[in-house]
Amino acid sequence: MWSEFKSFAMRGNIMDLAIGVVIGGAFGKIVTSLVEDIIMPLVGLLLGGLDFSGLAVTFGDAHIKYGSFIQTIVNFFIISFSIFIVIRTIGKLRRKKEAEEEAEEAEETDQQTELLTEIRDLLKQRAPHND
């Protein structure tokens, strides 16, 4: 049973997922700090010193912190946009690399075609003509 678990846990997909979760958590903390420590204070300044995190309304015993909710929405949009930019950049780099590889393959094919044409022409010159 231990060996089955070990082989399951060490499969490539599981390890990739674990690494992704750890990196995602760290990235989330960076973006949260960016939003809470830099962007939201600037937005508050633009809106006359308003601090979203402190916005709340109370109904009896219920304390509704809608400012925290607004901040969470801003976090979501910034994280989503950041991920979009990263994925778009990776896609562009991948397409550029593929285009370079295709151009290289086409060049190799052209060289091969040229060599084969030369070989054919040389063989024609050496072969007796059957006219």
From Swiss-Prot:
UniProt topology in membrane: Multi-pass membrane protein
Gene3D superfamilies: Large-conductance mechanosensitive channel, MscL, domain 1 (1.10.1200.120)
Any Pfam family the entry gives: MscL
SUPFAM superfamilies: Gated mechanosensitive channel (SSF81330)
GO molecular function, one term: mechanosensitive monoatomic ion channel activity
Superkingdom per UniProt: Bacteria
InterPro entries: Mechanosensitive_channel_CS (IPR019823), MS_channel (IPR001185), MSC/AndL (IPR037673), MscL_channel (IPR036019)
GO cellular component terms attached to this protein's record: plasma membrane
TM region positions: 14-34, 38-58, 67-87
Keywords associated with the record: Cell membrane, Ion channel, Ion transport, Membrane, Transmembrane, Transmembrane helix, Transport
Cellular localization per UniProt: Cell membrane
Coiled coil regions, renumbered to chain: none
Disulfide bonds: none
Recorded family membership: Belongs to the MscL family.
Oligomeric form and interacting partners: Homopentamer.
HAMAP family noted in UniProt: MscL
Task performed by this protein: Channel that opens in response to stretch forces in the membrane lipid bilayer. May participate in the regulation of osmotic pressure changes within the cell.
Name of this protein: Large-conductance mechanosensitive channel
Species of origin: Bacillus velezensis (strain DSM 23117 / BGSC 10A6 / LMG 26770 / FZB42) (Bacillus amyloliquefaciens subsp. plantarum)
